[in-house]
């Protein structure tokens, strides 16, 4: 068994039971964004979170243990994503990545935006021309040090 087997079991239970990520997140006690990432194998659950997931998805003790192991993050199956929605993010970074980098450096200096001390919020934004997806990414600024 490995983390991908647990992820597949979670997805199957979610579909079978008609669950929504927002409801799963409420039961586990964290944001829908973080819980979704965790259920998809990208975050480490605490024992309490793993037990809550275990109740929701009828997981075994071994499967709950896998949720508590630090995963291999960013483990998409291909270098360039083929899923259209994920590919749009790849495209956004390809087109706007240098702009984002320049503007962050201009505002903060030489450093990076953390993906560890990080939060994300995804909301629906009503628009008469067609609803929009609003994504807010917030990462701590980390300055490179000289030595």
From Swiss-Prot:
Gene Ontology BP terms: cyanate metabolic process
Name of the protein this chain belongs to: Cyanate hydratase
Active-site residue numbers: 88, 91, 114
Role description: Catalyzes the reaction of cyanate with bicarbonate to produce ammonia and carbon dioxide.
UniProt-listed InterPro entries: Cyanase, Cyanate_lyase_C, Cyanate_lyase_C_sf, CYNS_N, Lambda_DNA-bd_dom_sf
Entry keyword set: Lyase
Pfam families: Cyanate_lyase, CYNS_N
Top-level taxonomic group: Bacteria
E.C. numbers: 4.2.1.104
NCBIfam families assigned: cynS, PRK02866.1
SUPFAM superfamilies: Cyanase C-terminal domain, lambda repressor-like DNA-binding domains
Keyword Protease annotated: no
GO molecular function annotation: cyanate hydratase activity; DNA binding
Organism: Polynucleobacter asymbioticus (strain DSM 18221 / CIP 109841 / QLW-P1DMWA-1)
Reaction(s) the record says it catalyses: cyanate + hydrogencarbonate + 3 H(+) = NH4(+) + 2 CO2
Family per similarity comment: Belongs to the cyanase family.
């Amino acid at each position: 068994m490995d983390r991908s087997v647990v992820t597949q079991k979670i997805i199957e239970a979610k579909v079978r039971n008609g669950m929504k990520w927002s409801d799963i997140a409420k039961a586990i006690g964290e944001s829908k964004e973080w819980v979704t990432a965790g259920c998809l194998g990208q975050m480490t659950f605490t024992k309490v979170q793993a037990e809550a997931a275990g109740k929701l998805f009828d997981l075994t003790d071994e499967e709950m243990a896998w949720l508590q192991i630090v995963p291999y993050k960013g483990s998409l199956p291909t270098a360039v994503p083929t899923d259209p929605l994920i590919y749009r993010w790849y495209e956004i970074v390809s087109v706007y990545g240098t702009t984002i980098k320049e503007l962050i450096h201009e505002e903060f200096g030489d450093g990076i935006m953390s993906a560890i001390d990080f939060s994300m919020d995804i909301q629906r934004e009503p628009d008469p021309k067609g609803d929009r997806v609003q994504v807010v990414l917030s990462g701590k600024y980390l300055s490179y040090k000289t030595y």
